[in-house]
Structures are given as C-alpha cells and as structure tokens.
Amino acid sequence: MAVLTTHEIDCIIKELTSLNGSECTLKEELIERLIQQTREVIKWQPMLLELQAPVNICGDIHGQFTDLLRIFKACGFPPKANYLFLGDYVDRGKQSLETICLLFAYKVKYPLNFFLLRGNHESASINKIYGFYDEIKRRHTVRLWHSFTDCFNWLPVAALVGERIFCCHGGLSPSLRNLQQINHIQRPTDIPDEGIMCDLLWADLNHTTKGWGHNDRGVSFTFDKVIVRDFLKAFDLQLMVRAHEVVEDGYEFFANRQLVTVFSAPNYCGMMNNAGGVMSVSTDLICSFVIILPCHKYKMIATDANQMPTNEEE
C-alpha cells in the first residue's frame, strides 16, 4: 500500500478542518492508507511516552468532531501547539470517523508533537456496541472498522510529561510496581479483562471508601486519594492527569489537587450540559485550563483563570 505523500496528508487535514457540521468525503482507500501509516508511526513509540512541555492535554472527545475543532481554535492548531490526547476518540458522538481521521492525520504529520493515548473505547468489543462500528459500517465497510481496531491495538497507554506529570485514560493499578512495567506490555494487543493495562484504561476514582474498591462498571477497580498520594511519592511525581469520567466544569481535582480529571467533550451526548476542559502545561510545568463551553447554550469559548503550579512549593 502506497505511503501517503505530504500533499495527501495536507489535503486530508484541509478537508477535515474545513467541515462545518457535514460529513467528510474521504475515500475508503485513502482512509485505509492513513490508518496504516498511523500504525507505522505509533508502533515505534513506546507504551509509556516521555514528553516535554509545553503541551495541551485533552480528555474524552467521543466523536464530537465540531467540539474537537473548537479545541484547536481555542488552543492552537498543530504545529502551533503540542497535544496529548488521553483516549476515547470514538463512540457516542455523531462523527467518530472525522474525529479519528483528523487525529490520525495530525499524528502522521507531526509525530513528535502530537500524541494519542488509548482509551477504553479504542477496543473492538466496546466500540462495536457504542456507535463506532455502526457508523463505519454505514458509511464505508466492516473491513475498514477492522483496520481501525487493529491500529488501536498499537496505541500507547500512558505518558510522563516533564518527568513529573503522569497521564493515562482511566487510573491506577494495584499491579503497577514499576513504571517500566508499562513499556513491557506487548503489542499489538486488545485490552485485557484484568491487569495493568486494563486498570490504566478502566479504573475510576473512589470518593467514599478507602483503598482499592469495587468498580460499578464491572471491570477494574476504584482507588482513593491515599493511593494517589503514595503512587506520586513512590515515583517522584507531582501530578496525575486522567480522563474517563464526565466532570461538570471540564476538569475536576481529587486527592488534594494531586490528581485532575480532564473531560473534553462539552454537553456530552447532547444532554449533560457540562463544559469541556483542556489542561495546558507550560514549559515550567505550570498548569492552567481552557474551558470549552457548550456551544448550543453559550456560543463562546472561555479561558479559565484557575492556574495550578506543580512545582515543589505548592
């Protein structure tokens, strides 16, 4: 299969970023080549990415393509800004295809400035149920869906920013004793039912009970603020960033501001009326938040003034 030329990648990006609520007209053969090229890029990057700031960190997108474009308009289109996405690109929303194609195109175009982690919805068993499979089957073929899910099986699952900020989609794992265990996860792989990879993509916060708890999702665990504190101390980290749960203001702190949940799909599923958030990490690891308000209600984008230093004095 022929490698995409720079011109072809640019044309994909131009078409997608020019859409105004309509569906893209990318041909299946071109999308297939984009998928294969994305896989070749991500397979040479580790399961635990080690990134430098500045970077914008985004949570769940879930096929809300118009809101993804709003994020880029607010925070800067690549390569003017660096990005780390925490997973859950597909399902729920109406334009998973446009969403994942634009993210893949930017990954191919800017492989060292644009990073994609895996979420629990980047799995065949999940996105076959929650919308992605049906969308791809309706607009193209089941074969193309298989190509996407095969590529998802290569995505990294965690990242370190500036050696001090740990990022993943879901949460922590009782099996995680050394961060290099993450790099030892063999690819390609689907998401297992238990273990480190499962927990990194599925675990949730525990606001009521202590320690590790039962997860109502029926998979993985919940974890409390003491587990967060001990994890950060053990690995000389200052902050944990995760996604996976809707939060009203687009971001929400936990564990005495040692953990923050970032969720980037405003008015999730057209009914939650939540804001979307993006965490902006400066070169000196000062974190601030860009808030994407539900466009149906506010028709605007606002920048939050709440800044959080992650240096030793705080």
From Swiss-Prot:
EC category name: hydrolase
Domain of life: Eukaryota
The keyword Metal-binding is annotated on this UniProt entry: yes
Record note on cofactor: Binds 2 manganese ions per subunit.
InterPro entries found in the cross-reference section: Calcineurin-like_PHP_ApaH, Metallo-depent_PP-like, PP1_catalytic_subunit, Ser/Thr-sp_prot-phosphatase
Positions of the catalytic residues: H121 (proton donor)
Positions contributing to Mn(2+) 2 binding: D88, N120, H169, H244
One Pfam family it belongs to: Metallophos
UniProt-listed Enzyme Commission number(s): 3.1.3.16
This protein's UniProt keywords: Hydrolase, Manganese, Metal-binding, Protein phosphatase
Record field: catalytic activity: O-phospho-L-seryl-[protein] + H2O = L-seryl-[protein] + phosphate; O-phospho-L-threonyl-[protein] + H2O = L-threonyl-[protein] + phosphate
Matching PROSITE patterns: SER_THR_PHOSPHATASE (PS00125)
Binding, Mn(2+) 1: D60, H62, D88
Cofactor dependence: Mn(2+)
An annotated GO cellular component: cytoplasm
GO molecular function: metal ion binding; protein serine/threonine phosphatase activity
Family under the similarity heading: Belongs to the PPP phosphatase family. PP-Y subfamily.
Protein name stated in the entry: Serine/threonine-protein phosphatase PP-Y
Species of origin: Drosophila melanogaster (Fruit fly)
